[in-house]
A protein has these predicted regions:
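Short, ordered loop/turn segments at secondary-structure junctions
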Residues: 34-38, 61-64, 86-87, 106-110, ...
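Glycine-rich, aromatic-bearing surface loops/beta-hairpins
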Residues: 101-158
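Ordered, amphipathic secondary-structure segments that act as subunit-interaction surfaces
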Residues: 58-106
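Short basic, glycine-rich beta-strand/loop surfaces that mediate nucleic-acid
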Residues: 40, 46-50, 54-58, 67-83, ...
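Short, solvent-exposed amphipathic alpha-helical segments in soluble enzyme
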Residues: 21-24, 46-51, 95-99, 120-121, ...
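Structural motif
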Residues: 2-6, 28-31, 56-58, 78-81, ...
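A general structural motif
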Residues: 9-12, 61, 123
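Long, hydrophobic N-terminal alpha-helical segment
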Residues: 1-51, 56
Length: 158
């Protein structure tokens, strides 16, 4: 079944990911790619509490993820790969652009220098440029908070 979704969401694992995306897609594994969380059992325990028992959770570093992308893609488990920031997703795409070919932008919230593109998506001009580079390299990039809402292409984020 492979990797069903590559998602950027700065809240990491939470209800919208587990229920909003996980259930409709039939996800039975979430892979969180985050160096800090991968090194912290305490944080891993917190995120596991947000996931139902039927969903396996893996916490991996960026280096660990780049080494395992093809394995996850060929696995029978229905997998959602989640990063908390755009930089990590860009690095995953650079490591394997064939596997990381569709990128979902979820909750990326306000910080200094970012401006609202959608109610749940704030990006700097530099981040928009990075996303345009991903598209130029062949990745399909779209913002979509839930599968029940229409995706917004990069052009629509202006």
């Amino acid at each position: 079944m492979a990797i069903l979704l590559f998602r950027v969401d700065d809240r990491l694992i939470h209800g919208q990911v587990v229920v909003g995306w996980g259930r409709p897609l039939g996800v039975n594994r979430i892979v969180l790619v985050d160096d800090q969380v991968a090194a912290s059992e305490w944080e891993q325990d917190l995120y596991r509490m947000a996931v139902t028992p039927d969903i396996e959770v893996e916490f991996v570093t960026l280096n660990g993820a780049t080494a395992r992308l093809r394995d996850w893609q060929s696995d029978v488990r229905r997998t959602l790969v989640l990063t908390g920031d755009l930089e990590t997703m860009v690095a995953l795409h650079a490591a394997d652009p064939v596997t990381v070919h569709r990128i979902n932008l979820g909750g990326v919230h306000h910080r200094a220098g970012r401006r609202e593109r959608l109610p749940y998506l704030y990006l700097t001009d530099e981040e928009m440029t990075r996303l345009a580079a991903l598209e130029a390299a062949g990745a399909a990039v779209a913002a979509q908070d839930l599968p029940t809402t229409p995706p917004v292409t990069l052009k629509g984020l202006g």
